A protein has these predicted regions:
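Generic low-complexity, intrinsically disordered sequence content enriched
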Residues: 9-13, 109-111
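Mature extracellular/passenger domains of Gram-negative fimbrial/pilin and adhesin proteins
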Residues: 2-4, 20-188
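Bacterial Sec-dependent N-terminal signal peptides
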Residues: 1-11
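Hydrophobic h-region of N-terminal signal peptides that target proteins for export
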Residues: 12-22
Length: 188
């Protein structure tokens, strides 16, 4: 009987030694996978059915401006995001452009032809997030917009007001002005 017990103990010890050495290793493998999806939302800027839109202001006079930062005229515009991926729940828009100030709040007049307006710039106010002026430095704003349209044609709308403002102490001079900003969508 002792021989049977001894042989069982030796067999069990051998199996335990073999099975623990199976789990001892110095390396392993981790596999990663995912999916890259194409354009997450369709973009429509100011009824243009395009990613590029134009905001045209009403004519103003130099007398419409009374000092640095005063608004001569304003125009509302919107950026719509349609048919967003159902996984997207929040969106942010960031803006970049050439500005006249260190705070990145005033787009400069890029019209340089002879006779173009001077002392004028553009600001943009975010109507979705209160009365905050848009920064044109590419930074992501703190305010996100919830997506209303996961997978359907109901647009998620970002509403803005563009303002023509006096830049500096001298009143704007008569002439054409122009400016542009680039925006980027951040999906959350």
């Amino acid at each position: 009987m002792n021989k049977k017990l001894l042989s069982l103990l030796v067999s069990g010890s051998f199996i335990a030694a073999v099975s623990t050495s199976v789990f001892a290793a110095d390396t392993g493998v981790v596999n990663f996978n995912g999916k890259i999806v194409a354009d997450t939302c369709e973009i429509n800027v100011n009824y243009s059915n395009s990613t590029t839109g134009i905001v045209t202001f009403a004519d103003t006079y130099p007398a419409d401006y009374s000092g640095d930062g005063t608004v001569g005229t304003s125009k509302d515009f919107k950026i719509e995001l349609i048919k967003c991926d159902p996984l997207v729940t929040k969106l942010n828009l960031t803006f970049s452009g050439t500005t006249t100030d260190t705070g990145f709040l005033r787009l400069e007049n890029s019209e340089t032809a002879t006779g173009s307006a001077t002392n004028v710039g553009i600001t943009v106010t975010n109507k979705n997030g209160g009365t905050n002026n848009v920064k044109f430095d590419g930074s992501v704003p703190d305010v996100s917009t919830d997506v209303d349209n996961a997978g359907d044609s109901t647009p998620t709308i970002f509403n803005y007001t563009a303002n023509v403002i006096q830049v500096g102490n001298n009143a704007p001079t008569a002439g054409k002005y122009a400016s542009s900003a680039t925006f980027e969508v951040f999906y959350r």
